[in-house]
Swiss-Prot record:
Alphabetical GO biological process terms: regulation of translation; translation
UniProt similarity note: Belongs to the universal ribosomal protein uL1 family.
Name under which the protein is recorded: Large ribosomal subunit protein uL1
Native species: Rhodococcus erythropolis (strain PR4 / NBRC 100887)
Entry-linked Pfam families: Ribosomal_L1
Entry's Gene Ontology cellular component terms: large ribosomal subunit
Entry function: Binds directly to 23S rRNA. The L1 stalk is quite mobile in the ribosome, and is involved in E site tRNA release. Protein L1 is also a translational repressor protein, it controls the translation of the L11 operon by binding to its mRNA.
Length: 239
């Protein structure tokens, strides 16, 4: 196990590991316990009661965070002709087809999201082994395989995020930066949680949301009450 810094250990002492915090309390604590002087990213990890090995229990989806992520996503688009021009006009960072595929085959993955027009998907399939494990493979279910490239680029640049359960039944997503107001972090958290609850597979049995942890990228995890799904901003007095 990696040795923790003094700043991390001091931050961890502020957290009661046996307590389940409200989302608002967790947002405040995450900002207080960030162990970096930079504007840290605030992240959420959710453990779900599903079996990802079963196709009918794969949880995935998208959510437009009301306050964005605090980061302008770097977006690439696989398109040609008129659709390529539309993607460039919408603000896509890199647009291409064969040339872009070859660049990625060469090891370049410096982007946060990938969009493709339907006619390009057969070609993009050649780099599925590169994009898939990174959660970057365009998919119709997340709106990233589409003819409306303008909307897709604008959505992602505006704070749209994807979530997908991993092999351990965990979801990871960003809700903002430590510089965000507490309320904005909580509202982003609530928007994402709502979508995750809506994505519950009908075949999932027992408790769906088992565990939630909030942290900054370099800070300690803060356990959040998974039963708190409504009225998330009510804890101002005791947070």
């Amino acid at each position: 196990m990696a040795k923790r810094s003094k700043a991390y250990l001091a931050a961890a002492e502020k957290i009661d590991a046996d307590k389940l915090y409200s989302p608002l309390q967790a947002a405040k604590l995450a900002k207080e316990t960030s162990s970096t002087k930079m504007d840290a990213t605030v992240e959420v990890a959710v453990r779900l009661g599903v079996d990802p090995r079963k196709a009918d229990q794969m949880v995935r989806g998208t959510v437009n965070l009301p306050h964005g992520t605090g980061k302008t996503a770097r977006v690439i688009v696989f398109a040609v002709g008129e659709k390529a021009a539309e993607a460039e006009a919408a603000g896509a960072d890199v647009v291409g087809a064969e040339d872009l595929i070859e660049r990625i085959q060469g090891g370049w993955v410096d982007f946060d999201a990938a969009i493709a027009t339907p006619d390009q998907m057969a070609k993009v399939g050649r780099i599925a082994r590169v994009l898939g494990p990174r959660g970057l493979m365009p998919n119709p279910k997340t709106g990233t395989v589409t003819a409306d490239v303008t909307k897709a680029v604008n959505d992602i640049k505006g704070g749209k995020i994807n979530f997908r359960v991993d092999k351990q039944a965990n979801l990871h997503f960003v809700i903002g930066k430590a510089s965000f107001d507490d309320e904005k972090l909580v509202e982003n958290y609530g928007a994402a949680l709502d979508e995750i609850l809506r994505a519950k597979p009908s075949s999932a049995k027992g408790r769906y949301v088992k565990k939630i942890t909030v942290s900054t990228t370099t800070g300690p995890g803060i356990p959040v009450d998974p039963n708190r799904t409504r009225n998330l901003l009510e804890d101002a007095a005791d947070a």
